[in-house]
């Protein structure tokens, strides 16, 4: 995998190919970017899960991804680079699977199965890159890092699971599982983008995802975007945080392995839970509290390892 650094500000993160002492600085910075990514995903998920109850999931998906296109179009102007054709292809494939994943997850939310959709998608999306990094890429995390990865996956399940009555269980479970597979594949494709590629592959990623969502929205309903102004604005805000998460994730990959960054960036359920308690007055279950603590410990172990 080509991972070289460039001279622009956003490309000034050290490459994986530099000396060992340089990597000692890189990895903590990588974890910081991964944590910023998980906060961004959590905020995006918080806004999107709420609006998906009131608006059509297809229309919410289109708006979320439209926001990503708009933000990346501006960002790419200032984030120059030297992308190869392979970088652009990986960006396009990341967009295709990401668009499908967002659509399926929002459909699961719309069916009222948030309690099982959120933990299922979160666990799968973090597990797929870990298996890929270890089994395919041959990565060998340290014992401390491996402990953090395992604890992180368990923490994801605990913090995102909600008690209470389950509705539309099996259908939501299947949709969330497939969505998690697509999100995991998105992480893998993003990891193949070179450090000096700049922002254009991520712009292509968002355009491809938007085209998928827009096509589905137009073929299944009369509108491409939510009919209410509130629904559109909320979805757009979710999209801004969503693309921020992608950018932070790619930056995190420059100093850490795919397995480590994916698990650290997948702790977004903790953010969603805290926002739900603070803003919506939702109840925090005791196991979610354990999950929040586990998430913090997992990130700490990954950083130390």
Q: What is each stretch, according to the model?
A:
Residues 35, 39, 66, 92-96, ...:
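Residue-level signature of the transmembrane alpha-helical core
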Residues 67-72, 127-132, 143-161, 287-304:
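Hydrophobic transmembrane alpha-helices of multi-pass small-molecule transport proteins
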Residues 93-99, 106-156, 202-208, 258-278:
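Specific alpha-helical transmembrane segments that line the substrate/conduction pathway
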Residues 42, 46, 73, 95-103, ...:
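Hydrophobic/small/kink-forming positions within alpha-helical transmembrane segments
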Residues 2, 6, 10-43, 47-93, ...:
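Membrane-interface interhelical linkers
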Residues 72-81, 129-144, 182-199, 242-258, ...:
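Hydrophobic alpha-helical transmembrane segments in multi-pass integral membrane proteins
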Residues 125, 155, 172-189, 212, ...:
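Alpha-helical transmembrane segments of multi-pass integral membrane proteins
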């Amino acid at each position: 995998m080509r991972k070289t650094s460039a001279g622009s500000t956003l490309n000034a993160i050290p490459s994986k190919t530099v000396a060992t002492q340089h990597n000692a600085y890189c990895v903590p910075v990588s974890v910081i970017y991964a944590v910023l990514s998980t906060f961004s995903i959590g905020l995006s998920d918080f806004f999107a899960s709420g609006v998906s109850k009131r608006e059509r999931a297809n229309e919410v998906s289109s708006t979320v991804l439209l926001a990503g296109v708009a933000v990346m179009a501006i960002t790419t102007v200032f984030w120059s680079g030297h992308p190869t054709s392979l970088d652009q292809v990986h960006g396009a494939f990341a967009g295709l699977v990401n668009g499908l994943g967002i659509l399926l997850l929002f459909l699961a939310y719309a069916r009222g199965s948030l309690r099982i959709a959120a933990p299922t998608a979160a666990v799968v999306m973090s597990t797929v890159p870990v298996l890929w990094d270890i089994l395919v890429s041959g990565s060998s995390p340290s014992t401390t890092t491996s402990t953090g990865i395992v604890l992180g996956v368990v923490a994801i399940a605990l913090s995102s699971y909600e008690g209470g009555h389950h509705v539309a269980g099996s259908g939501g479970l299947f949709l969330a599982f497939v969505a998690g597979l697509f999100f995991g594949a998105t992480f893998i494709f993003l990891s193949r983008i070179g450090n000096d590629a700049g922002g254009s592959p991520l712009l292509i990623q968002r355009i491809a995802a938007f085209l998928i969502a827009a096509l589905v929205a137009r073929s299944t309903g009369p509108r491409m975007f939510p009919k209410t102004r509130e629904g559109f604005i909320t979805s757009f805000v979710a999209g801004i945080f969503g693309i921020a998460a992608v950018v932070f994730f790619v930056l995190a990959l420059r100093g850490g392995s795919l397995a480590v960054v994916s698990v650290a960036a997948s702790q977004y359920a903790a953010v969603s839970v805290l926002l739900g308690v603070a803003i919506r007055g939702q109840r925090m279950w005791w196991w979610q509290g354990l999950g929040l603590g586990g998430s913090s410990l997992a990130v700490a172990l990954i950083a130390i390892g």
